[in-house]
């Protein structure tokens, strides 16, 4: 089952592609964009830590945008490489840690935040390991990385606009869906490897 975000990504590729082509023509490397995404994620983390949640959200969006563009720039500029893939995957994990662990500064339980980080990383690990074994994992599970970033964005938005309590309820839902995705991916890989 292909996730909703995977389908949306395929549709918005038409929007990202012209921007990626422009950046490629300007000789902006995909690896630079990947690094920029990490820098924005670090700034996001520190802005949340400093209780500048609105500014934090802005940098979260910038970071996520870099993540959406870097691979397309590499493809358009024909600079896809093992190094780029390694950087992208590794820095994505660091960004995931920053995105979610910043919730501690909103007053969320550090234990629950640590579990959420662990679950998120486990989802990514299962995909990476499965794909290293030749299994396709895109679209497996109800909350892929893109959806998790959207959840982080909405949780922060609700924290500002509504209340901490409402954002906390959404965080609990985020944790539940993340745990379900771990189970879904584990089961999918287990089933495929047993055949």
UniProtKB/Swiss-Prot annotation:
Metabolic or biological pathway, per its Swiss-Prot or TrEMBL entry: Lipid metabolism; phospholipid metabolism
Topology of the protein relative to the lipid bilayer: Multi-pass membrane protein
Binding site for Mg(2+) 1: 67, 70, 88
Catalytic activity: CDP-2,3-bis-O-(phytanyl)-sn-glycerol + 1D-myo-inositol 3-phosphate = saturated 1-archaetidyl-1D-myo-inositol 3-phosphate + CMP + H(+)
Active site: 92
Keywords: Cell membrane, Lipid biosynthesis, Lipid metabolism, Magnesium, Manganese, Membrane, Metal-binding, Phospholipid metabolism, Transferase, Transmembrane, Transmembrane helix
Main localization of the protein described in the UniProt heading: membrane
E.C. code: 2.7.8.39
UniProt keyword Cell membrane, yes or no: yes
UniProt record similarity statement: Belongs to the CDP-alcohol phosphatidyltransferase class-I family.
Name of this protein: Archaetidylinositol phosphate synthase
Gene source species: Saccharolobus solfataricus (strain ATCC 35092 / DSM 1617 / JCM 11322 / P2)
Gene that encodes it: pgsA
